[in-house]
Amino acid sequence: MRVIMDPLRRTLMTLFLFLFSFFISGTVSAQRIEWQSCMTSPYSDWFGVESPSPELLCGYLSVPLKYTDTGGDISGENIPFVRLAMTKLPAKSKHKGSLLIISGGPGLPGINPYINFDWPVTNLRESWDIIGFDPRGVGKSIPAINCQQPDGKRSENITDKQRILQRINACIHNTGAEVIRHIGSNEAVYDIERIRQALGDKQLTAVAYSYGTQIAALYAERFPSSIRSVVLDGVVDIDDLNDNFTWQLRQAHSYQETFDRFATWCARTKSCPLSSDRIQAIHQFHELLLKLHHSPLTDSRGESISSDELISLTTELLLWRSSWPTLATAVRQFSQGIVSNEIETALNSSIVSEEISDALGVILCVDQGDEQLTLEVRKSRKKALADAFPAVNFKRGLSDFPEFCELWPIHRDLNKTRLNNAVLPSGLLFVSHKYDPTTPWINARKMADKFSAPLLTINGDGHTLALTGTNLCVDEAVVRHLLLPRKTEDITCQGSGAGDTN
């Protein structure tokens, strides 16, 4: 069974017999990471069928489940620990420090992060340890968010609202209310500081991607003097944290803009039967979605391919310009009633795991304030979001039942935990594609202005690119900033698709 997530929340959202038995309790101070080879037990099963590099080291870092308002230890209490799964790829020669990779999501694992070490990125590999970690509640960190329900306990013939409430109850029961209360971005920021201290670095050197840029920017607000060099790629606007609807609406508009560019490219290259005319392309895509909705296709394993699968695949493949040919093939084949091995592979590889889906939903909801909407406001917002990204909203009529986060009972309201620090950090570099559907370029422009930091604009379509080896201009600028952080002017690099959609 494929796990399909709401397209506007994708890019945008063990039983608690743990009770704390999986925690260590005590006082946290100057915790160390006991590094061991990742080839040894219990770490060898962290990576599934993929064998890690023999050089890769693994370990856990214990951090407090909850912090004081300033990130300190809570005295007088026996505070349970969370154990963060960590990896280290040691520097090849003289060690100068650690480069921490902060993953996106929320909910994406971050151990053994992918970096292309071709030149110029190889310069980092020589003298910097590459550090990855699974954030609290995610992946191999303990405890992990778990919202799964045994098949026998999943009720049939219930309303959508009841189905959401069942999942919420499973999240809280399996993970524990106290764990969930401290699973959000507020604690994740303080975890970064504990990681820096455990690594023995005087200041933080890091690259953050997508949602990880939210953590990095909040860290820069709270610990400006602890920043050495931090690159934020695919930028979240932290000033939108007090207005969830605004960032959702901005993201929806950006997705539609990217769809329009995809359709124009598709028509020009004759890759799929979409028109370069915006209205006509949306109409054609709606016809295909309706066709799949009423008469789903079937893959070689007997799995159904409906409109939900195409929407999920579309929102996934629109993110990267290099994936557009695959999306075009899917649109063309589905229009013809065909499902090739290539598209089956794309559908299966784009599936979001249940664990990632759980973590994304829970962390987003915990971070949001307790927002109770009237029926009129809820309908108005849903209509605005549907109008902003009309390509995937083909069904007539909108449901009026509350969304997952509106029904979610445990909130921390991340915006209320922010610190107004008058000191601006140096050493930040913001990176963004000009046409990024999920973290729009305007986010990066606003954050660069807020922190008086340079902005690297990639003139093209995509989402996150730093240190992947696919754009020499970007990698040179990022590596230069990481090795020798200094205030520079804004930078522009040409990216995939620049100028070829018109």
PLM region descriptions:
Residues G26-A30:
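Sec/Tat signal peptide C-region and signal peptidase I cleavage site
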Residues Q31-E309, V362, Q368-N502:
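Gly/Pro-rich cap/lid or specificity-loop segments adjacent to the active site
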Residues Q284, L288-K291, L313, A330, ...:
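Charge-rich, solvent-exposed alpha-helical interaction surfaces
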